[in-house]
């Protein structure tokens, strides 16, 4: 049995669905929301690499590396903001973050 494009797309669709459900079903914990966003970006990267490999060019793989770099920076900045927020408020609940609005 050969692993084809449909297998990669199925795995990516499952990861994308898990990430989307994680965002919509969990409205209390910011860390879980950030992890769900990372799952969505991982699904996008799997699609980019799969399409790139099956078409025979490297543009999708280079773009996937760019997306990985941006996702790592986004996660680092998001976690740094959460650490500072936790030090100030003592909680990282979404309701407390909504209280920061102007």
UniProtKB/Swiss-Prot annotation:
Specify the enzyme's EC class, one word.
translocase
Subcellular location, in the record's words?
Cell inner membrane
Q: Name one GO biological process term.
A: ATP synthesis coupled electron transport
Reaction catalyzed = a quinone + NADH + 5 H(+)(in) = a quinol + NAD(+) + 4 H(+)(out)
Which E.C. number(s) belong to this protein?
7.1.1.-
Example GO molecular function term? quinone binding
Any transmembrane segments, and where? Answer: 5-25, 31-51, 66-86
Alphabetical GO CC annotations of the entry are: NADH dehydrogenase complex; plasma membrane
**Which keywords does UniProt give here?**
Cell inner membrane, Cell membrane, Membrane, NAD, Quinone, Translocase, Transmembrane, Transmembrane helix, Transport, Ubiquinone
Q: Its topology with respect to the membrane?
A: Multi-pass membrane protein
Answer yes or no on keyword Membrane: yes
Q: Which InterPro entries match?
A: NADH_UbQ_OxRdtase_chain4L/K, NUOK/Mnh_C1-like
Disulfide pattern: none
Per the entry, what this protein does is: NDH-1 shuttles electrons from NADH, via FMN and iron-sulfur (Fe-S) centers, to quinones in the respiratory chain. The immediate electron acceptor for the enzyme in this species is believed to be ubiquinone. Couples the redox reaction to proton translocation (for every two electrons transferred, four hydrogen ions are translocated across the cytoplasmic membrane), and thus conserves the redox energy in a proton gradient.
Assigned protein family = Belongs to the complex I subunit 4L family.
Supply the NCBIfam families for this chain.
Answer: PRK05715.1-2 (NF004320), PRK05715.1-3 (NF004321), PRK05715.1-5 (NF004323)
Q: What is this protein called?
A: NADH-quinone oxidoreductase subunit K
**Name of the coding gene:** nuoK
